[in-house]
Each structure stands twice: as structure tokens, then as C-alpha cells.
Amino acid sequence: MSLSDHVQKLTSTLEQAKLVPGSAAALIPEGFQPTTKLEVSFANKDLDVGNFFRAGECKLAPSISFAAEEGAESGASYTLFLTDPDAPTPDNPQFAFWRHWVLPGLQPLSGGAVVAQTKPALTEFLGPGPKDDSKPHRYLFLLYREPQGLDLKKEDVGGEEFVQRRSWKPAEFAEKHGLKLVGVNWMTCAGDGWTE
């Protein structure tokens, strides 16, 4: 899928899921135009702007790929967020945004969408885990271009403990550290035992 097709599908699905406008409007401004297509794959099952996963399919960190932005500086680095706006449930998102993963120092390699990870995770990957009695949650993968010289530490993001990951403010974090949103993908996920 081309970047322009991806943008159209992304915009449409974010609106249908009431993310933009809606619960993620502070993170993804209305009218946002990605400058790269963020590709995410869990064990060879690709995210496709809002498709459905079971929690058991998402236990291991996914592969991430994206092409260099047109006109971006050589050696530009990017930070990835994975966050849940529906914690603990979509009907009661009192712990939104749940911080599942913060991965800085991603660099697209020349000639394709392969990405090098040049820095350790600021928040280690914790797979989606909605309870079986919860409606499916929406999970956002957000890719930000880092300003030159950005050197974040784990303490800048927050603790790794379960309760320390809740009620994170990703929009404030991005603004404070000069991160520029350039790519978005998202999925829905339910517990392995969830039934409609």
C-alpha cells in the first residue's frame, strides 16, 4: 500500500474508532499527515490500521519497519510509543494512556524499510493484555522524529512496574522533548477468552 493510500485508510479508521477526533486527539492532531508508513508485525501478522488481534498473538515484541522520510536529515533517529487509550476498559479508561513500550534511537537503513535499533528501550515491551471480560482495546503505535542530540534516560519516561505504566501523558512527553509525530498505526486487541 502506498503512503497516500495508507494516509486515507488511517484517517478513515481513526475517525471510525473515535480516536481522532476523540480520545487520541491530543496525540494525533486532526488532519495529521504521516510522512512515513509505520509497519508493525507480530510473528508475521501485520498491523493494518485497526485490525484485530488476540492478546496471545502479541506476547513478543513486534518487528518495526519504516522508510526514511523524504527530505529528512541523514542519520535521523526516531522514537516509537505503544500506548493503550482504553485502560483498564474502553468504558472506563481511567488509566489511559497505558505505556506499553517506548523505543528510542530507531534509524531506517538506506534502500528500504529495515530499521536499526541504536539505543535500548526506555520502557521494555509489555504486550497488550486486556481482560477477557473487557471489550477490545485500541492500541496506538506512534512514531516520532527525534531532535538532534536527544539523549533520554529511563527515568525521563517513568518506571517499569505495572502500576507505574498507567496514566502516562504521551502528548506532554513528546512536546517536552521536541518529538515530531511522523507515523501512526494501530490495532484492536482482546483477551484470548473474550467473546462478543
Language-model regions, residue ranges each:
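N-terminus-centered regions that define maturation/targeting leaders and the start
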Residues: 1-196
